[in-house]
């Protein structure tokens, strides 16, 4: 009996000695991952660096030169909940993902649509907003245009922001049209207002807002978006802790109604227009 007990104890100790190193190694790996998370960088710095680009009503300047918009509210609330301040890094849209990858900022909160191509390069959170792609057209140039087929002709000129999802959608769905791309939405819109392009392809709700703002010049050829999309925060790959935190933050702000309230204010009302620069 005593020999059997001794044998069992020996086997238990042997098994324990085999298990402890892997457990210790796993714990060490977890500690290293946590220490390497951008969350730790943000906390030590005391600031959340956010990459963004101006895009009404996501982000824009007010009459005092300060940034306002849906994304700005989201980033400020996120930083507040983390106990840090928000720092915004305005970036050209076609270079915003490369800038994230080189560490110019911690994440992108900038109306960035989730696409498979982008997701191969960066990680996306769950959607915190949903928008669509629509166009606003010049009344003189696009008289009678009501479908995508009406615009799908070589003599038709479309304007869009360079590198943005609407430009990609225009290439795919209206391939015969001539597409001109601009660094800013305002420049693309101006091309249509000046009668140099038939339509401006962009994300909702901009087309409807601009049609209301310029009723003598612009109209909505199609009342509904022709592509639906979803926007998420983008962050560098290999950071599961940060992805988990941001996903849960979005979930909680959806559950308490804060994201919807802010989204409705910026996307379904024009109460903010007096604050924005024309």
What do the PLM-derived regions correspond to, one by one?
Residues 95, 112-121, 169-172, 193-194, ...:
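A ligand-binding cleft/hinge motif common to bilobed small-molecule-binding domains
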Residues 28-111, 120:
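Extracytoplasmic small-molecule ligand-binding "clamshell" domains
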Residues 35, 72, 88-98, 143, ...:
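Short helix-initiation/N-cap motifs at beta->coil->alpha
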Residues 60-64, 75-84, 147-152, 166-183, ...:
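Ligand-binding cleft/hinge of the Venus flytrap
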Residues 130-137, 204, 208-251, 269-278:
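Periplasmic-binding protein-like
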Residues 139-156:
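Flexible hinge/capping segments at coil-to-helix
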Residues 48-49, 84-85, 102-110, 155-157, ...:
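Alpha-to-beta junction loops
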Residues 27-33, 165-179, 250-278:
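Ligand-binding clefts/hinges and TM-proximal coupling segments of bilobed small-molecule sensing domains
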């Amino acid at each position: 009996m005593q020999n059997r007990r001794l044998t069992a104890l020996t086997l238990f100790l042997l098994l324990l000695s085999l298990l402890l190193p892997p457990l210790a190694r796993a714990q060490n790996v977890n500690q290293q991952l946590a220490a390497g998370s951008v969350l730790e960088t943000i906390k030590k710095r005391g600031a959340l660096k956010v990459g963004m680009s101006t895009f009404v009503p996501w982000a824009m300047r007010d009459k005092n030169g300060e940034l306002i918009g849906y994304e700005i509210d989201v980033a400020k609330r996120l930083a507040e909940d983390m106990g840090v301040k928000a720092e915004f890094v305005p970036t050209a849209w076609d270079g915003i993902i490369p800038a994230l990858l080189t560490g110019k900022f911690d994440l992108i909160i900038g109306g960035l649509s989730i696409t498979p191509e982008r997701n191969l390069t960066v990680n996306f959170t769950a959607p915190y907003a949903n928008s669509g792609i629509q166009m606003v057209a010049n009344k003189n140039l696009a008289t009678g245009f009501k479908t995508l087929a009406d615009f799908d002709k070589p003599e038709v000129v479309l304007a869009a922001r360079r590198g943005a999802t609407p430009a990609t959608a225009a290439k795919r769905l209206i391939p015969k049209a001539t597409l001109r791309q601009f660094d800013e939405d305002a420049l693309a819109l101006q091309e249509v207002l000046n009668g140099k392009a038939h339509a401006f392809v962009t994300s909702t709700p901009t087309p409807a807002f601009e049609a209301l703002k310029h009723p003598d010049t612009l109209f909505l050829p199609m009342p509904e978006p022709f592509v639906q999309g979803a926007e998420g925060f983008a962050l560098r790959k290999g950071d599961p802790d940060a992805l988990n935190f941001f996903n849960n933050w979005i979930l909680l702000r959806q559950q308490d109604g804060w994201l919807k309230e802010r989204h409705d204010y910026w996307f379904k009302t024009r109460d903010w227009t007096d604050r924005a620069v024309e």
